[in-house]
Amino acid sequence: MTKTLKLNTALFLALLLISGFAIYHQLGDFAYLKNADGVLTDMRSMVLWDIRFPRIGLALLTGASLAIAGNAMQGIFQNPLASPGLLGSSAGATAASVFILYYFAVPFSLLLAGGVIGALLSFLIVYLIAKNYGTTMMILSGLAVNMLLGSAIALLLSNAESPWALAELYRWLQGSLMWAKLDTLLISLPIVLVGIFCLYHTRRYLDLLTFGEETASTMGVDPKRSFFISTFGVALLVGATIPQTGTIGFIGLIAPHFARILLKARPSQLYLTSALIGALLLLLADLAILYIPLFSHIYIGTLTALIGAPCLIWMLLTQQRKIYD
């Protein structure tokens, strides 16, 4: 058994174990929720299907999606500080979701659609501006779009007339899994799978970039086409998760770091490991909020930032050699 297989197996088993603990601990031994035949009553089924399963599923899906997107962006730009929202997709999904939440009373499925459209539109704007000017221009354009959309969000919040709506928007912006719904989760799953397929399709491009874009071109890879497909996939992953959770940072940044430290493999070989680590980190963060009194009043986006920032600084300071060999 290879090191990669051993690590991925261990991470998968850890996810199963912790997910099982979360379900059991939430339910407890509610014997009074069973009928005389020992069958689950409607109340216990509701706790499982309307609360625990959607929340755990959203933690796993969001953590894995952000980690996969982060690994792709760090490989594409050959920069360990690249995040999933570098090209504006995160800000676009956030701005669209905030606008919809404030002005329209719509089901979460339509909020999801708006977030995906916002992520894709902002990414396409950045891409069209900088596609002929190289990665530096692409990053700067993404930064400009992120700042513009961030200002638009701040302007909307500062002019909000409803205190209740303003409070809800602030809660959403801090990131949480409390809005998890099974139907929305199932709708977002195909979008995530399409994004993963885009990145799988361009995995060879990602590996060849470690030797430079010119090398990728000489090996029969179309850099511009592959760049667009891979970054489009990242935008789909980001757009499918942010409307459901709000802003959750650092998962897409530190999960690929952990994967590289543990495996030291090619970027395309780190996708699965990064996904498992990202899912595990977000699930543990959610459990900490639910069961540790110290974190009970902290939103998950705040907690991931509080933990992720020191972890990132530690990793950057302790690594004495280049992350990409």
Where are each of the predicted segments found?
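Alpha-helical transmembrane segments in inner-membrane proteins
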Residues: M1-D325
